[in-house]
């Protein structure tokens, strides 16, 4: 059996490339939501810092848990919006995800793909950061978890981001761009740019970095036709970047 055939055998319900999964007005609404997030991100960067934060920080640490909870709520709300549009068009959550794990073989395949992809993903992040140079934007460093409760909530928020953002951007948006007639490369690029812009609160350089990472996620989704490896890598990357790497490298 060829490698591609073996991989396809683990797919219970692959994402159907080029198929419209929600109405065009619904897509316009999604993009309007993204526009609002870009505007809020711009205001966060250029407005006064929240709480007792220094000028170089978006907010003081006392705001960490409330911000975690708001971020999780916004992610689930965005996924719910996508699901409503897909459901009205006759789809399900599997329309967005490409299906869940059904066998241990599929778990092993997806984890085997996720591990090297995460290493390449991290390398790309460091490389783009290096190319862009020093970042003068306000950072979220003061919001990183310190206490056990904050760490546990952070892990929950990371898992939420992995599930919701992958389904929203790679499952919904990338599929809709393909249905508009964009080729695979154009759809992957477009959703990656929108994904980066949704993180505009981190400043323009980080927006560029996140756009590149979003393109990589989109390429993985286009290849695998499901989001299982994407979700694993996304959630793990957030846990690693926001908490675990600071324990390992301190």
Regions found by a protein language model. Give the residues of each.
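Transmembrane helix-loop-helix hairpins at the membrane interface
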Residues: 12-13, 118-126, 130-250
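Residue-level signature of transmembrane alpha-helical entry/exit and packing/kink sites
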Residues: 22-30, 63-71, 106-110, 150-154, ...
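Surface-exposed loop/turn and secondary-structure junction residues enriched for glycine/proline
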Residues: 96-100, 105, 143-146, 230
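N-terminal, membrane-interfacial amphipathic/helix-forming hydrophobic leader that caps
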Residues: 1-104, 126, 131, 242-250
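Interfacial segments of alpha-helical transmembrane regions
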Residues: 98-119
């Amino acid at each position: 059996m060829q490698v591609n055939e073996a991989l396809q055998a683990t797919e219970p319900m692959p994402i159907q490339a080029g198929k419209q999964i929600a109405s065009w007005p619904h897509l316009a609404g999604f993009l309007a939501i993204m526009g609002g997030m870009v505007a809020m991100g711009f205001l966060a960067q250029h407005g006064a810092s929240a709480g007792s934060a220094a000028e170089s920080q978006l907010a003081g640490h006392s705001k960490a848990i409330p911000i975690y909870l708001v971020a999780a709520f916004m992610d689930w709300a965005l996924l719910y919006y996508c699901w409503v549009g897909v459901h009205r068009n006759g789809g399900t959550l599997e329309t967005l995800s490409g299906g869940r794990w059904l066998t241990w073989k599929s778990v092993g395949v997806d984890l085997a793909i996720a591990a090297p992809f995460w290493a390449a993903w991290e390398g790309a992040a460091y490389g783009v950061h290096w190319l862009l140079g020093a970042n003068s934007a306000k950072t979220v460093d003061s919001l990183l978890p310190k206490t056990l409760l904050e760490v546990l909530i952070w892990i929950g928020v990371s898992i939420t981001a992995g599930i919701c953002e992958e389904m929203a951007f790679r499952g919904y948006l990338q599929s809709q761009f393909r249905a508009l007639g964009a080729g695979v490369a154009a759809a992957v690029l477009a959703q990656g740019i929108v994904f980066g812009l949704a993180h505009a609160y981190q400043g323009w350089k980080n927006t560029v970095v996140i756009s590149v990472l979003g393109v990589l996620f989109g390429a993985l989704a286009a290849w695998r036709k499901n989001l299982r490896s994407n979700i694993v890598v996304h959630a793990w990357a957030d846990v690693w970047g926001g908490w675990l790497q600071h324990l390992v490298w301190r």
